[in-house]
């Protein structure tokens, strides 16, 4: 017998593993590429808006801690949820994800995500970039056939029958799925399940990026990272003298460094001058990213970059502050998921892990040389708090975003 109130649980896991590199000049996408990814590029500006708003929301909770999350993971899970939401619940989800409904139709939103996920999971992709969606359904719960069909067609979702009456077995089944999909990097995502849960939706994203040109491991040395004016922590720091795409923003007092991965992903690392990080955070928007990208110049610098190991673990009920409210309470209308009228989202958890180090590089044994101007290059030391954003270039999608306040994760 079903309980009087049914709960849906949303779990999101993201892993980003990076190995060191340098930057190459940005290449303009061809018309063919523009057309090939047109559906996804239609939704990417809204995803960028959401990424920045969610970042600011996390900063408002604590401006002294590391931040790391996967906007694409959150986006994928909640648009999948929107497939089965109706009326105000659906409107709130799509508006909270920053879609402007006067500019883009629901058809184009879901079409864009279908193309996006297909692009990520291509076997010939040089990047190790995969996403997965798991639907864990109580063995006694009957889902609406259209929701199952659409989630499979648009999101390639896996469906599992689950006995939620056996709480421990259900947790193990779901955690084993997450561990497998993140290649063992995220374990025990679910610590507890509400007793009345009958449906769990899990999204996983796994990304391992290899930089085009590696740092030399023998140059890595310990340096002090300045957490704040009173605190430093020792951190293993990679060093490289070379040609990089960089820009110093005089208006915001920050360095911008673009790093290119093998394949179609890039990262922007933003290093504010001491005491200027809040100024930069307040200025973040799409136009600022465009300004930085336009002004990047290839030049010689002496780069110091710390090894990073941080994670983020977030209760996504904070999305209420972005206007997504009904789905979490008694007003939820998820009648497109199940014919039961009392289904609500009781738990929504997102965990993401990032490691930036020298492990796993396949560039060992390769030789690389480049010309450096005779003049003394500037030194750029990422040895104080910095912001970063990782994008998939073809689709212009934000994969990960974060802030490093302490690269050791403490």
UniProtKB/Swiss-Prot annotation:
SUPFAM superfamilies: Serpins. One of its GO terms (molecular function) is serine-type endopeptidase inhibitor activity. The modification Phosphoserine is found at residue 375. Glycans are attached at residues 63, 100, 264. Gene3D superfamilies: Alpha-1-antitrypsin, domain 1, Antithrombin, subunit I, domain 2, Serpins superfamily. SMART domains: SERPIN (SM00093). Plasma. It holds the Pfam family Serpin. It comes from the Eukaryota. GO terms for biological process: acute-phase response. Residues 365-384 are annotated as: RCL. The record marks 374-375 as: Reactive bond. One of its GO terms (cellular component) is extracellular space. The keyword Transmembrane helix does not apply. Residues 1-21 form the signal peptide. Inhibitor of serine proteases. The primary target is elastase, but also has a moderate affinity for plasmin and thrombin. The reactive center loop (RCL) extends out from the body of the protein and directs binding to the target protease. The protease cleaves the serpin at the reactive site within the RCL, establishing a covalent linkage between the carboxyl group of the serpin reactive site and the serine hydroxyl of the protease. The resulting inactive serpin-protease complex is highly stable. This is Alpha-1-antiproteinase. It comes from Didelphis virginiana.
